Amino acid sequence: MKNRLLFLGPPGAGKGTQASLICKDQGFLHLSTGDLLREEVSGGTDLGKKAELIMNKGELVSDEIVISIVEKRLIKYSEGWLLDGFPRNLAQASLLQNLLGRISQPIEIVLLIEIDDEILTERMLGRGRKDDNKAVIKNRLKIYKDQTSPLVDHYKKQGILKSINGCGSVEDVNSRIKEALS
């Protein structure tokens, strides 16, 4: 299995759940930008306070904030990692590619988890996060489609993109992911 992975997909697609399973199984570092940002928010850091205002509106946190958090983690860990939730747009992909080039850790495979908007909304409302409500979810899905979708073409052109269906049980989706990554 490849050991430098990137998971793409809309919010609520199960990226975090699947990333945790793959990382536990393979011993990889799981870098979830959403979790990293929530840690900053719960820690009450200056970055966390800025991020909270942005996240509560359903908007994306600035590239500079996110890349600096990711960089700190990757510099300390080079064995195997999975990025979940970053990059979300071509500008972030460029920043990430520059960072990974500097530390000689290029992405080996990008996995796109695809799923229907109605299922996504149900899943997100069921998570119980304070930044998940119907208006915020609708805005997040629109932002995803507008800004993140071009990444599919970007990584497809690089020959490192694989897509899987994210519907079904956690176990079924995990089996599809393992097959795609082998």
Curated annotation (Swiss-Prot):
One of its GO terms (biological process) is AMP salvage. The keyword DNA-binding does not apply. Keywords: ATP-binding, Cytoplasm, Kinase, Nucleotide biosynthesis, Nucleotide-binding, Transferase. AMP binds at residues 33, 38, 59-61, 85-88, 92, 129, 140. InterPro entries: Adenylat/UMP-CMP_kin (IPR000850), Adenylat_kinase_CS (IPR033690), P-loop_NTPase (IPR027417). Its EC number is 2.7.4.3. It catalyses: AMP + ATP = 2 ADP. Pathway: Purine metabolism; AMP biosynthesis via salvage pathway; AMP from ADP: step 1/1. One of its GO terms (molecular function) is ATP binding. Residues 32-61 are annotated as: NMP. It is an enzyme of class 2 (transferase). It comes from the Bacteria. It is found in: Cytoplasm. GO terms for cellular component: cytoplasm. Residues 126-132 are annotated as: LID. ATP binds at residues 12-17, 127, 168. Consists of three domains, a large central CORE domain and two small peripheral domains, NMPbind and LID, which undergo movements during catalysis. The LID domain closes over the site of phosphoryl transfer upon ATP binding. Assembling and dissambling the active center during each catalytic cycle provides an effective means to prevent ATP hydrolysis. Monomer. Catalyzes the reversible transfer of the terminal phosphate group between ATP and AMP. Plays an important role in cellular energy homeostasis and in adenine nucleotide metabolism. This is Adenylate kinase. It comes from Prochlorococcus marinus (strain SARG / CCMP1375 / SS120). The gene is adk.
